[in-house]
Curated annotation (Swiss-Prot):
The gene is rph. GO terms for molecular function: 3'-5'-RNA exonuclease activity; tRNA binding; tRNA nucleotidyltransferase activity. Belongs to the RNase PH family. It holds the Pfam family RNase_PH. This is Ribonuclease PH. It comes from Actinobacillus pleuropneumoniae serotype 5b (strain L20).
């Protein structure tokens, strides 16, 4: 039996709280069970140097974990003086996922940065961050429209992500930490509303997985992400 007596294909309870902080143009607290991530979207009227004069905008992301978001305290990366490889990989993944659903030309020459800070980690922090960041980004874009800066929302749709894996020989959806740390195969899947995939990250930690198992995991992810997309639409009243 899975933790919390979940079925193999069952997603943890998902909660998306909008307008969580005061100052950011878009602010969301997203909760996947006991995993909690704060996602704040900031709009700046500038673009990176490589986009100067290109008549388009940019969407980027940063990711971090609070020192006591895990079972034992981690040292802040700022105290170490550099970001770790895992952090850089995750924030690039978040940014790529968000750009997949934004018309950068329609955004104009401005940058939206989404800061994703893990308050509490119990597996799936990057997938929760992507799912929450999308809602925060949507709110930031909607504010640009409401303020008369843009005529239309540049977002082309929604994007969400979930973890799947093989634990004790079973394909499971939305892994908690205890499952993730014991998984034979661990995979993160990012998908947009029409079912197309943005990214698939899959690794066999123990035995290699078969082609059939890959298809089974992708099917589980598709089911789970559709539930997350429904939660996003409900939160945004779309």
């Amino acid at each position: 039996m899975r933790p919390n007596n979940r079925e193999l294909n069952q997603v943890r309870p998902v909660k998306i709280t909008r307008h969580y902080t005061r100052y950011a143009e878009g602010s969301v607290l997203v909760e996947f069970g006991e995993t909690k991530v704060l996602c704040n979207a900031t709009v700046e009227e500038t673009v990176p140097r490589f986009l100067k004069g290109q008549q388009q905008g940019w969407v980027t992301a940063e990711y971090g974990m609070l020192p006591r978001s895990t079972h034992s305290r981690m040292q802040r990366e700022a105290a170490k003086g550099k970001q770790g490889g895992r952090t850089m990989e995750i924030q690039r993944l978040i940014a790529r996922s968000l750009r997949a659903v934004v018309d950068l030309k329609a955004l104009g020459e401005r940058t939206v940065t989404v800061d994703c800070d893990v308050i509490q980690a119990d597996g799936g922090t990057r997938t929760a961050a992507i799912t929450g960041a999308c809602v925060a980004l949507h709110d930031a874009m909607s504010k640009l429209v409401a303020d008369g800066v843009l005529k239309e929302n540049p977002m082309k749709g929604l994007v969400a992500a979930i973890s799947v894996g093989i634990v004790d020989g079973n394909a499971v959806c939305d892994l908690e930490y205890v499952e993730d740390s014991n998984a034979e195969t661990d995979m993160n899947v990012v998908m947009v509303e029409d079912g197309r995939l943005v990214e698939v990250q899959g690794t066999a930690e123990g035995e290699p997985f078969s082609h059939m198992e890959l298809l089974q995991l992708l099917d589980l992810a598709h089911q789970g992400i559709n539930q997350l997309l429904d939660a996003q639409r409900k939160a945004l009243a779309l």
